[in-house]
Amino acid sequence: MIGIIGAMEEEVTILKNKLTQLSEISVAHVKFYTGILKDREVVITQSGIGKVNAAISTTLLINKFKPDVIINTGSAGALDESLNVGDVLISDDVKYHDADATAFGYEYGQIPQMPVAFQSSKPLIEKVSQVVQQQQLTAKVGLIVSGDSFIGSVEQRQKIKKAFPNAMAVEMEATAIAQTCYQFNVPFVVVRAVSDLANGEAEMSFEAFLEKAAVSSSQTVEALVSQL
């Protein structure tokens, strides 16, 4: 069983509509769609936006469906200036950009008693990288950071870049999903696409290009599923 998590309806609808033998259940106001995609058993959930929603949905998915791997799909704001709308983002590490326990000796972004970063599954990273090469998509592997804020100003962007110079993208769920997977020992990878450039025009760009980002990320996830 392969678990796929997206925060918004636009981020999961494309994949959900491709499921055969579709079945739907709801647990704690979270909808889960099970079926067959590329001859593989999958469960897709729309988690809702933000870290708590993501953690709840991931926990429910793991407990009820026992997935072998989890893929987080959707959109993100680019922090790397070489990225453009529609480019595919593949996580190697994910971190929180809004966690601060430095007073107790932890690194900025680190939750106490948790790793500095949550590492994606190397085999999954390799498979996604192969998929995007085959599809001739522009993609980048790197650090994705998460927090409970939509990054829509130059000031917000600069603050994150100062704290995490190597971060390529920012969004609102991936690290919570990753932390949950870490605690349940489930391999994960984040496969998203750029919807905006996390700057003063981010809100307008996000609304205009969310669909393009959803198509790019969904295409990649569908191809990845066929390889698992």
Swiss-Prot record:
Cellular component, GO, one term = cytosol
May I ask which residue range the UniProt record assigns to the signal sequence? none
| InterPro entries according to UniProt | MTA_SAH_Nsdase (IPR010049), Nucleoside_phosphorylase_d (IPR000845), Nucleoside_phosphorylase_sf (IPR035994)
Q: Is Transferase a UniProt keyword of this protein?
A: no
Give TM segment ranges.
none
> Pathway it acts in?
Amino-acid biosynthesis; L-methionine biosynthesis via salvage pathway; S-methyl-5-thio-alpha-D-ribose 1-phosphate from S-methyl-5'-thioadenosine (hydrolase route): step 1/2
Which GO MF terms are attached to this record? adenosylhomocysteine nucleosidase activity; methylthioadenosine nucleosidase activity
Q: Does the keyword Cell membrane apply?
A: no
Positions contributing to substrate binding: G77, I151, M172, E173
Q: Which UniProt keywords apply?
A: Amino-acid biosynthesis, Hydrolase, Methionine biosynthesis
Name the enzyme group at the top EC level: hydrolase
- The reaction(s) this protein catalyses: S-adenosyl-L-homocysteine + H2O = S-(5-deoxy-D-ribos-5-yl)-L-homocysteine + adenine; S-methyl-5'-thioadenosine + H2O = 5-(methylsulfanyl)-D-ribose + adenine; 5'-deoxyadenosine + H2O = 5-deoxy-D-ribose + adenine
Q: Which Pfam families match?
A: PNP_UDP_1 (PF01048)
Q: Which residues are annotated as active site?
A: E11 (proton acceptor), D196 (proton donor)
- Tell me which PANTHER family the record gives: 5'-METHYLTHIOADENOSINE/S-ADENOSYLHOMOCYSTEINE NUCLEOSIDASE (PTHR46832), 5'-METHYLTHIOADENOSINE_S-ADENOSYLHOMOCYSTEINE NUCLEOSIDASE (PTHR46832:SF1)
Which family does the similarity line name?
A: Belongs to the PNP/UDP phosphorylase family. MtnN subfamily.
Task: Describe its function.
Answer: Catalyzes the irreversible cleavage of the glycosidic bond in both 5'-methylthioadenosine (MTA) and S-adenosylhomocysteine (SAH/AdoHcy) to adenine and the corresponding thioribose, 5'-methylthioribose and S-ribosylhomocysteine, respectively. Also cleaves 5'-deoxyadenosine, a toxic by-product of radical S-adenosylmethionine (SAM) enzymes, into 5-deoxyribose and adenine.
This chain belongs to the protein called 5'-methylthioadenosine/S-adenosylhomocysteine nucleosidase
Organism (species): Staphylococcus aureus (strain Mu50 / ATCC 700699)
> Source organism lineage?
Bacteria, Bacillati, Bacillota, Bacilli, Bacillales
